Every structure is written in C-alpha cells, then in structure tokens.
Amino acid sequence: MTRYAGWIIVASGLLAQAGCATHGPAEQARYQVSQTCNGALHCYATIQAALDATEGAPEGGWILVQVGPGHYIEKVTLKRSRVRLRGAGVDRTFLQFDIPAQDAARYHRDHWGTPGSATLTIDADQVIVEGLTIENTFDFLSNDALPDDDPRKIVNSQAVALLLDKHSDRVLVRDAALLGYQDTLFADGKRGLVRHSTIAGNVDFIFGGGQLLVVDSTIRSRPRTAAFKANEVQSIVAAPSTLLAQRIGIVVYRSRLTREQGVPDGSVALARPWHPTRNFPDGRYADPNAVGQALYIDCFMDAHILPDHWTSMAGTARDGSKTALFTPQDSRFFESGSRGPGAHHADIGIKWTDAPSIAEVTRVILDDWPEASIGGLP
C-alpha cells in the first residue's frame, strides 16, 4: 500500500482517499445559471455569462457555478481556475451546440476547426464539471450517409463536445455525459480525469495528446450510416497522439465498452495511432514523435469490438500526401484484464510491453492534484 498527497493506492490499483469524506471543495463564491432568474442576485441566463462574472471574484478560492435544469444552447469557454461547474443531473441539465469543424475555424486561436467546434472548452487548472450532459449536436449521421461526391457533404465532420485545451490541468469530469459522434472528447492539455460518466461517439471519439484517465465509466459506441464492406472497421474508440517523452496517454480503467443499436459485431477498434500534421524545419508532415499510448485495464468489452482490437491510421507524408501509414505494432497500445464478448482478440504482433501499471498511472495523473479538487475516489 502506497500513500501520497492524501491518497492511498492499494494493491489492486484502486484509489482511496485518506481521511476525507467530502465530495468537493468548499466554495468562497457561488453563481447561479437559470432560465428563470427573475432578477435574483448572481443569477444568469447563460453559462458563459456566469463564468464571465466569476472574473470579478477574488483569486484563490473555489467558485461554484450551479446550472439549473434546461437546455443551454451555447458555446462555452472556461478559463478561470478553481471553478466547479455543476448541473442538476445528466438528464436535467444540457449544454449543447451544433457546429462541425468545417465551420468552426473562426472560434479557434489558430483557426483550427476541430478544437474550434467544442461545445465546452476548458483552458484552466483545477476544474470540476459534474451533473450535466455536454453535447455537440451536429447531425453527423445525415452527413455520413451522403456519398463522398455529394456537394452537400461536409468533409471536416469532427464535432467536439468537450475540449481540454492547452492550458488545462487537473480537470475532473464526474457524473456527466459527453455526447457526440466524431471527436467527442479532445484531451489536448495536461491531466484529465473522467469518472462515473458516459462518453459516446463513433470515430476517434476519445483523442489527443493529453494525459487522460477514464474510470468506472461507460464508453458507448454509436452507429455509422456510411456504406461499409463486410468486416470493415467502421469506428474507433481512441486516437491518442501521445508524445514519446510522455509516459501516460489515454487510459481506460474498470469501465464498460458498450454500443448503441445498429453497431455491428466486430466493427469497432479500441484505438488507432494519430500522428498530427505539424511544422518542422524540413517541412510539414505527421509528427514522428507522437507515438500514441492507449491502455485498457480491467474493462468489459461487448461484441462490437474488432477481433484485432487495434487498427492503423493514415498520416501526412513528407511529400504532403496522405500516404504515411502508422500501425498498432509501432504504437504504445496495451490491454489487460479485459472481459466480455469482445475481449478475445487475435495476435497481431503488438510488441510494446513497457506499459505502466494502474498504480503508476494514478500516481502520475494525481501527482500534485489537491484532493479537494477531486472528491472521494472511489
């Protein structure tokens, strides 16, 4: 048994909090979001207005933004540290916005549509998001059904629900739902923790180069409407772009990989390696140092999981063409303790064996993470 920063890692790898029964930090300021404020003090009609108002609160303490029941149709950016964004429950409070990457470049500092499409962007340290559904409501399925040569087809159909942006760290999402199709959760910052939540999507719907731990959650694959050949990979759960210098990437622990109606058996890969296209002194091409890491530990897998479990991903070659192919065999992919109809898998020659244990993962993810910002784990 190991102790650190108020936490205990027991032999099984479970996390337990030492001497603390609280479920969140004490707040020094509170703001309310409601569709019926009726002139109440510190009550706002939109989530963004409430977050903007928090800028006037003194620095240092935690701030609670309590969001009432309802559908809030807005793009939200959270930049203040030590904010607790709390809804009335995943079936009562909904933060939603409808935009794909193709139309969202104007919302991003580098004019990149994928992060620009995010319904909720978090770019702060020590943030708790709980008790609400966050969704990008772009109609992916209607677009997916269009032929590639249809002029109405949106090519860049990524539509992010939650972006953990570059300056984010120690972000906890719990008792929440993240809904989308392609690119639902973009982990592009430092450390994130998702617990007792649902993440739903189909193409690369948990992705990025950040350190992300998903615990005791449901990873729900959603259907495609495009035409596929028999036994063709239709969807991918994770697309990590973890830098080689980073020990931890995307880790799914003690969670359930389920599917919605219409997702065929053997059609969904656990992960594929994303090598983002970046600028280098000798050109612009797929980053060779982004050797993605994805770990699945003690997870239930339904029959929709691909028999090979992992698949390849194309990237930008040095000549600018999309001919570079990155394979699972050259990535940092690993699983242990899998169970369920989709747990059995073929041997495709995965050679990477230096996978961290769940105890190491939790030490890295929770290092210097004040226990007040996490609550009771587990």
Task: Label every PLM stretch briefly.
Residues 6-17:
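Bacterial N-terminal signal peptides
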Residues 1-4:
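Positively charged n-region of N-terminal signal peptides that target proteins for export
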Residues 25-378:
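Sequence-level preference for short, compositionally simple segments enriched
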